[in-house]
């Protein structure tokens, strides 16, 4: 699926399914629970990450708009992290 969003406050959340994401446009940061945005590198076009289901994480778009391709192993959902 293609997803686009602009800058917004990051929220720690979880998904049921694993996913793989490729940044197509813009610059982002992605981090796991226990880290902060300051702990991780900026991810630009071509950057990739694998996110295990059930693992709390957050991400933020640092550009006017970010576009990503996401491949899910199952149902697409999102819930606030415990």
Model regions and ranges:
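Short histidine-centered beta-strand/loop micro-motifs
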Residues: 1-2, 10-15, 32, 40, ...
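Structural recognition of the beta-strand scaffold that forms the well-ordered cores
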Residues: 21-22, 48-51, 60, 67-70
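Double-stranded beta-helix
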Residues: 58-82
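Glycine- and acidic-residue-biased ligand/ion/polar-headgroup-sensing regions
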Residues: 6-8, 15-35
């Amino acid at each position: 699926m293609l997803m686009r969003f602009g800058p917004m406050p990051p929220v720690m959340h979880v998904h049921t399914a694993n996913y793989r994401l490729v940044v197509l446009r813009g610059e982002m940061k992605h981090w796991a629970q226990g880290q902060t945005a300051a702990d991780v590198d900026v991810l630009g076009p071509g950057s990739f990450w694998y996110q295990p289901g059930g693992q709390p994480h957050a991400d933020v778009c640092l550009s006017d708009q970010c576009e990503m391709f996401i491949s899910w192993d199952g149902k697409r959902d999102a819930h606030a992290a415990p």
